[in-house]
């Protein structure tokens, strides 16, 4: 009979097979009441599952990360229960967990409305109040098919067909409603009280636009109502910071239907964009990168050689001319290999670091486009390092150091680094993968920072490092990458002359720090809510006169600051000074300079910050020094 070993090393013996819930009850009534599921020998199981042999057991409660995921998954099933009660003809598709929530795809003959979503949420709350048990039944395949056939759940039957090797499946019953899942799920609906439906959208069956359209209901669920309230507050803050709203408020950019997924940059937004590009150009030059420029439109022949035509054609914009097929480049790497291939390269030329602010275009589905975060036309801070296998570790270590410096300059210090390792389907020997993964792991270790493995998540041809930034709202943004690639140099016949005069293939390291400029600017807008650090702000200082008498000196101040390399402008409108201050505060200009008669007499400026802090009057030279210091700090705090 089983002996159960708990996380603290203590053991409990039973004279009969025992469920997770029964083990929890033997420890204490409080734990039993909080038990969602269990982890038996590292595998998640339902609270009702039997343990028949000696095993280690961790009781899962809402406080555990896995517990939160179980709550969210069970809430998705609860959506199904409510929808089927309200709309009996709806057909349920799938309801997975996503970051901070869940969704359920539903086939129904009309789009859901906000009123429908409110009705579904109300019915879910009513079902939770019934405090019913969720019943799990491991059911033979034939019976599963019978259950869903009798209910007309066509999509569930298709999902069963996708699992030909499964002879028995878990069915979870919410009263009269049944759903299919690997589980585990909550034992009772009382665990689901802290939930909220958040939005509705369209989706396609299996994510393919050629298939039928479905309705998708998104929601979130948490361990308790306090966590839910904090999440809702965070979402409301995120809505206030939406880059589309702030972009319009600050007159940075716009998008329009005639050019879907393309950005119209206005003067202020283009200034911000240029700040990023000039900064990246400087840091790359300081770190040994040579900047290049490659064509936008390239013959199909190159894309066939690189493999993009067969694997990526549906995402490429194509055209024809004079009986030749072309594609607008979706990425820069094949073109960079063409530059490398011009002229004989020696081992003495390596590492060769080639950078381009490459404008790329990808035919993203129209439904996936989102402001400037998800676009069809974008520019990358793209670079490729051609090196020997022995040089990979140092190049990777240098890149990590550079990337972390850049992120710090933009005000991001909470960085997660992950190493994605070999997938099951891959090319290359295990020895090659061992060396490649080992070099990247050693480079990560040299950074002195924590990092983690992502087993099996590498590309089929090589491992990669990913950098994820956490913003002020706790959201994660995957930005930088370093991809090890021995494959493309092989396909495009890149080589160098080794020390022994033999021809060898270089390793190619694909790398980006910001990624898409458009997406990174969208992140910056939301992270700073448009109140950019002085070095990035489109206008760093605005000079405002109180009356026409001070206009000449205001213009002189503007000219002096501009000649010193600052972005300053005058506001000489015949408006009250309070009106001007309010307007430029809303435009989030870092420094507001007010000039009255006293400032003209003393050749000084009265300085206010956009936060409303009165910094007093000071000589123009002193303000210029203050602004220069703020610019030199970039996005770092004064203490850094």
Curated annotation (Swiss-Prot):
GO terms for molecular function: ATP binding; metal ion binding; threonine-tRNA ligase activity; tRNA binding. It is found in: Cytoplasm. Its EC number is 6.1.1.3. One of its GO terms (cellular component) is cytosol. Its cofactor is Zn(2+). Catalyzes the attachment of threonine to tRNA(Thr) in a two-step reaction: L-threonine is first activated by ATP to form Thr-AMP and then transferred to the acceptor end of tRNA(Thr). Also edits incorrectly charged L-seryl-tRNA(Thr). This is Threonine--tRNA ligase. The lineage of its organism: Bacteria, Pseudomonadati, Pseudomonadota, Gammaproteobacteria, Pseudomonadales. The gene is thrS.
